């Protein structure tokens, strides 16, 4: 067990199920499969109302195909463990939301992708860094002016920095629901990290999305067009954020028209 990480009952039960799946497979493969199945379940549930038409139809179908490919590689008895393990994650985060649950489990299980040199910064460290660097004043100005603001992590890992930033937002906006005024964007080159970050943002009830991509080659704090590489949280499609995107797009269109007229 990694030092400094507390093992709760939920975590212990999750680890028991995980170790059963590892009897005939490498632990990193099992972890990657778990994260993929959990993330696809959440992501496809989020876009289901939009999946009847393109471009979401292709995205939904592709992810369903990937889900079936992974789950069919396990025996029926093993398949039943995945929803049980996912439920344990949900219960643990309901009990204690202020944590990097998946990052801690990753270290607790001593899983590592040695080729990628992965190491997840402890949540306490991320929380300390965020408390020092997070510009509450600037964020407050943006929300007051625009009605909303965004927080972006270009190398999100399991999402610890974004989660700690959401804590700052919660403390800052005590009079109203920060989840309706701040959205969170993560990006990572490792698809398993994308899954981990996405799962945690979704289960924390945060609006936003996580992008699978190389930040050094293509930094994308704005919403890119290739939707197959984007994982939207459920609340991103809430009425509040749907209206915010609508007004934002209208504002952009208005500025373009104004700019075009001024040139004429």
Which ranges hold each PLM region?
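Proline-rich intrinsically disordered, low-complexity coils
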Residues: 49, 55, 219-224, 234
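Generic hydrophobic segment detector
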Residues: 83, 92-100, 165-171, 188, ...
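Class I S-adenosyl-L-methionine
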Residues: 2-174
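Generic alpha-helical secondary structure signal
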Residues: 14, 18, 22, 64, ...
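Acidic-enriched, low-complexity/disordered segments with a strong bias for Aspartate over Glutamate
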Residues: 9, 33, 100, 153, ...
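Conserved S-adenosyl-L-methionine
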Residues: 125-231
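SAM/dcSAM-binding transferase cores
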Residues: 223-264
């Amino acid at each position: 067990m990694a030092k400094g990480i507390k093992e709760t009952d939920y975590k212990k039960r999750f680890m028991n199920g995980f170790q059963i799946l590892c009897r005939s497979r490498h632990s990193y493969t099992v972890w990657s499969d778990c994260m993929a199945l959990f993330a696809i379940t959440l992501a496809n549930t989020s876009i289901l109302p939009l999946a009847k038409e393109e471009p979401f139809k292709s995205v939904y179908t592709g992810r369903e195909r990937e889900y079936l490919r992974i789950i069919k590689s396990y025996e029926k008895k093993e398949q039943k463990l995945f929803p049980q393990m996912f439920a344990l994650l949900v219960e643990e985060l309901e009990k204690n939301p202020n944590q990097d649950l998946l990052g801690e489990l990753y270290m607790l299980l001593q899983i590592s992708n040695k080729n990628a040199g992965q190491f997840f910064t402890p949540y306490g460290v991320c929380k300390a860094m965020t408390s020092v660097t997070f510009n509450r004043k600037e964020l407050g100005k943006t929300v007051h002016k625009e009605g909303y603001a965004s927080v972006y992590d270009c190398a999100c890992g399991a999402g610890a920095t974004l989660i700690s930033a959401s804590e700052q937002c919660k403390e800052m906006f005590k009079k109203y629901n920060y989840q309706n005024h701040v959205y969170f964007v993560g990006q990572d080159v490792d698809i398993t990290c994308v899954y981990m970050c996405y799962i945690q943002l979704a289960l924390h009830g945060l609006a936003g999305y996580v992008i699978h991509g190389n930040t050094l080659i293509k930094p994308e704090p704005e919403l890119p067009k290739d939707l197959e590489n984007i994982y939207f949280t459920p609340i991103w499609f809430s009425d509040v954020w749907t209206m915010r995107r609508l007004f934002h797009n209208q504002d952009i269109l208005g500025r373009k028209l104004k700019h075009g007229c001024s040139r004429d």
